[in-house]
């Protein structure tokens, strides 16, 4: 195949799972084409002399035969295969890698723990929104990476010898989910963390991001149970008590926890509790990408943008031919409304960002059809890949777009968990009003307005005589007041 291919592949031979990511480069960003993950549990095949068993190696090779079929379509220069903790440790890693290279037809690189940490950080920096100064945590099968950084630059990198597979074999070997086993696992993890904790705290962070299967599992549990998606020590302790209550690993049942993730969940949970405790982490969210994304973006030599969300919104506006001027116009009106009521409603900066994002995409449904455009918009946003936005934030955006006009579906605003239900209602009200007053699609036709909030009552003051001079506008606003009143949102217009 010619080297003009836009396909790239990244393969990560992890201690618990092997992963393959195949992407296509599209206008400076990546479009995911294939994700394959297989639980190989390589680390479980290490004996006391750190030799890999033949069975574990065979499981790995079998998985790579599946991957090899997909790699035939991609130029070798656009494939990167890396091996991590278990193959750093195994005394017979050379035997495994020689055959792996033969199967895949390309080199396999065993990377150092620091290089693994750097790549994980790059993957997060390219795909995850939020504050610029971050702490990234990745709990693997046999190692845990902790990285601090600002923007694209790392400030400290650590790869520690503990992982969910090795801790499972060491502290939950009897498969008992007893308090003593958790205590021993947490104590050992804290001892591993202690030598690096001061340096991590010295560099500091504004946001903490988790980039591993353990954190993914926690996110799935919390979404399934209707909680908000922020991981806190309190929630981790509750899940630990739930696990202890189940008694044994084979009887572990928690809403939202898949069978595939259950085996290494308690050991991963113990490590995460130790990290939260030792580093005094307040809350953590899930990263948009990690090691494989870091490999791909490294091959593409793409720079890390300061604002991932803005890049995502720009790409989608281009792809769906959204009228960018109109999106900006609505966003400007919405931002003005938000700034006038934020103190009375105690709204946070992230809510403003999410409202502006909804404005940028509010006409995406028109790319399908004018009829049911809000439903089309909600469907598209729910199902598009939106780097920089968490799953809960995507759901909120979809819900706001569903309710941008026509009667309000209050239950949908209450089913999202990115923000409290009351905040979702408030953002929805501001979006609807902004769309109405920017509907003439000209900056000079947007009236000067003041918006005041008094508890749930919104009072909108228009220029004198505006309602008389704009009979259609008056009718639309009267209809909007009626729709808002149906869901007990009082709106007065003067």
Curated annotation (Swiss-Prot):
Gene Ontology MF term list: guanosine-5'-triphosphate,3'-diphosphate diphosphatase activity
Signal peptide: none
Catalysis: reaction(s): guanosine 3'-diphosphate 5'-triphosphate + H2O = guanosine 3',5'-bis(diphosphate) + phosphate + H(+)
Keywords: Hydrolase
InterPro entries per the UniProt record, alphabetical: ATPase_NBD, GppA/Ppx_hydrolase, Guo-5TP_3DP_PyrP, Ppx_GppA_C, Ppx_GppA_N, PyroPPase_GppA_Ppx
RNA-binding found in the keyword field: no
Keyword Zinc-finger: no
Alphabetical list of CDD domains matching this protein: ASKHA_NBD_EcGppA-like (cd24117)
Pathway(s) the chain acts in: Purine metabolism; ppGpp biosynthesis; ppGpp from GTP: step 2/2
EC number from the UniProt entry: 3.6.1.40
GO biological process, one term: guanosine tetraphosphate biosynthetic process
Similarity comment: family membership: Belongs to the GppA/Ppx family. GppA subfamily.
HAMAP family: GppA
NCBIfam families documented for this protein: PRK11031.1 (NF008260)
Function, in words: Catalyzes the conversion of pppGpp to ppGpp. Guanosine pentaphosphate (pppGpp) is a cytoplasmic signaling molecule which together with ppGpp controls the 'stringent response', an adaptive process that allows bacteria to respond to amino acid starvation, resulting in the coordinated regulation of numerous cellular activities.
Protein's name according to its UniProt entry: Guanosine-5'-triphosphate,3'-diphosphate pyrophosphatase
Gene source species: Escherichia coli O17:K52:H18 (strain UMN026 / ExPEC)
Originating gene: gppA
């Amino acid at each position: 195949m010619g080297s003009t291919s836009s396909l790239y592949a990244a393969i990560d031979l992890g201690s618990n799972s092997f992963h393959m990511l195949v992407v296509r480069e599209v206008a400076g960003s990546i479009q995911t084409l294939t994700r394959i993950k297989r639980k190989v549990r390589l680390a479980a095949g290490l004996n006391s002399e750190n030799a890999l068993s033949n069975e574990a190696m065979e499981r790995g090779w079998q998985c790579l035969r599946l991957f090899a079929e997909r790699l035939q379509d991609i130029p070798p220069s656009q494939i990167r295969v890396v091996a991590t903790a278990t193959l750093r440790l195994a005394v017979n890693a050379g035997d495994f890698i020689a055959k792996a290279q033969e199967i895949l037809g390309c080199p396999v690189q065993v990377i150092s723990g620091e290089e693994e940490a750097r790549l994980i950080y790059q993957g997060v920096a390219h795909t995850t929104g939020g504050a610029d100064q971050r702490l990234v945590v990745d709990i693997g099968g046999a190692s845990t990476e902790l990285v601090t950084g600002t923007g694209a630059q790392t400030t400290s990198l650590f790869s520690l010898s503990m992982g969910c597979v090795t801790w499972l074999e060491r502290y939950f070997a009897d498969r008992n989910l007893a308090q003593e086993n958790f205590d021993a696992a947490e104590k050992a993890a804290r001892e591993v963390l202690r030598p690096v904790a001061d340096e991590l705290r010295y560099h500091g962070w504004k946001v903490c991001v988790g980039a591993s299967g353990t954190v993914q599992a926690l996110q799935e549990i919390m979404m399934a149970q209707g909680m908000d998606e922020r991981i806190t020590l309190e929630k981790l302790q509750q899940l630990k008590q739930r696990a202890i209550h189940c008694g044994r690993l084979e009887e572990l049942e928690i809403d939202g926890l898949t069978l595939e993730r259950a085996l290494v969940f308690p050991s991963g949970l113990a490590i995460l509790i130790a990290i939260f405790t030792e580093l005094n982490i307040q809350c953590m969210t899930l990263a948009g990408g990690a090691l494989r994304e870091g490999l791909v973006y490294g091959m593409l030599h793409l720079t890390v943008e300061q604002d991932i969300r803005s890049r995502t919104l720009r790409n989608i506006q281009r792809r769906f031919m959204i009228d960018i001027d109109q999106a900006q116009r609505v966003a400007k009106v919405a931002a003005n409304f938000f700034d006038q009521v934020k103190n009375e409603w105690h709204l946070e900066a992230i809510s403003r960002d999410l409202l502006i994002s909804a404005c940028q995409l509010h006409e995406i449904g028109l790319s399908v059809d004018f009829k049911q455009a809000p439903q089309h918009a909600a469907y598209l946003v729910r199902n598009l890949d939106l780097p920089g936005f968490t799953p809960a934030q995507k759901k909120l955006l979809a819900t706001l777009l569903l309710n941008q006009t026509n009667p309000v579906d209050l239950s949908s605003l209450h089913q999202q968990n990115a923000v409290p239900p009351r905040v979702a209602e408030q953002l929805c009200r501001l979006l609807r009003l902004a769309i109405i007053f920017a509907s003439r699609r000209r900056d000079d036709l947007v009236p000067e307005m003041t918006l005041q909030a008094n508890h749930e009552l919104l009072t909108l003051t228009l220029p004198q005589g505006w309602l008389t001079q704009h009979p259609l506008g008056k009718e639309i606003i009267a209809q909007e007041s009626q729709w808002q009143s149906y869901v007990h949102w009082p709106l007065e217009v003067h």
